[in-house]
Regions:
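Active-site beta-strand->loop->alpha-helix modules in alpha/beta enzyme cores, enriched
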Residues: 1-91
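The feature marks non-catalytic terminal segments
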Residues: 9, 86-220
């Protein structure tokens, strides 16, 4: 299900680190504590270091690790940020976290309150409140005569997760994706991210032309 979803989104690679989802919890230390024994933390850290070194990513995007996020998701985000922090500053990818919100959310445009975490004396979850968050409007139209929106792509990807019934409740939900820069990002991170979001606005596929056989739906 995850692989089908990522294929629809155009992901190039899926890497699973084979760690146990032992139960639902909002306590990240159930897996991050050195004596937790749930995840092989040494193997995870080594794998992340190797992946970042080999792939030389421009960006690392995590979920926003808030106190009410699933503890495993918090842990995964923090481990990724740890790996970025272990790199020389000039070689780091830009690190961002994402939240999806409704268009009428009271906290739209406000920075998320993240759990406090540090590694090797560097605060991992401090975020930059300026510039304002980089955003993607899921209601942005596309396709023939702008009949679809980006929300349709998100919904089709979510719909692949049939074994997790609660996931289907997110179909059609969420209007705005907000992306916040972490302080541990390298110099010029804001400018690099701004350039990336400009590129994301470019159409991914050429517009199709429909002949008169399409009747009133023919291209104009």
């Amino acid at each position: 299900e995850q692989r089908r979803s990522l294929e629809l989104l155009g992901a190039r690679m899926l890497v699973r680190l084979q760690q146990t989802d032992h139960r639902y919890t909002q306590d990240r230390m159930e897996v991050l504590a050195e004596d937790a024994g749930v995840w092989d933390l040494a193997a995870v850290r080594a794998s992340l270091d190797r992946r970042l070194a080999e792939e030389q990513y421009d960006f690392v995007v995590t979920l926003a690790p808030t106190a009410t996020t699933h503890g495993h998701h918090q842990a995964a985000s923090l481990l990724a940020l740890e790996a970025v922090a272990r790199m020389p500053e000039a070689e780091r990818p830009v690190a961002l976290c994402c939240q999806v919100k409704a268009a009428d959310a009271d906290d739209l445009g406000e920075p998320p309150v993240l759990v406090v975490a540090e590694a090797a004396g560097e605060e991992l979850t401090a975020i930059r409140t300026t510039p304002a968050p980089f955003t993607i409007d899921r209601n942005e139209p596309f396709g023939h005569r702008d009949r679809l929106t980006l929300k349709a792509i998100a919904s089709v990807a979510i719909a692949q997760h049939l074994s997790q019934g609660t996931m289907l409740g997110y179909i059609g939900a969420g209007d705005v994706e907000e992306y916040w820069l972490f302080d541990l990002s390298p110099p010029l991170a804001a400018a690099r991210t701004a350039d990336w979001f400009v590129q994301l606005q470019d159409p991914s596929f050429p517009e199709r032309e429909y002949t008169s056989s399409a009747g009133t739906n023919a291209s104009r």
